[in-house]
Amino acid sequence: MATIVPLKITEDGVDGSLATCTPGGDEFTNTGVEFIRITNDHASAGYTVTVTAQTTSYYLPRYGKLTKSNTSDAVTAGNTIFLGPFRPSVWNDANGKVQITYVLTSDSSTITGSHLLKIEVLYLEQK
């Protein structure tokens, strides 16, 4: 598992830095303003990206008791998806990190080192 360092988006922009997704999954430190961009450069294979909910039952005064499940989204060949932001009370593990895993959509097998799935974590500074 690799830890991805979030990149700050500023008025001057940001140079994207897509990293190859790690077969065992990836993680990033989450403050609640981060989102992820995942790009599939494969010509035909699709992948399913899962963000693991660490707290599956929580309470919000306005809505009452809520149940949260993992978020899974497919990224088809040649496409990009964006996910987030991630509420820390739901998504952060004991180390304050969000956990992300990847499988092939066709057979749910774990990705291998030869896949073409890329990820970056971005955030806007909140003032």
Spans of model-derived segments:
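Surface-exposed, low-hydrophobicity beta-strand/loop segments enriched in small/polar/acidic residues
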Residues: 2-127
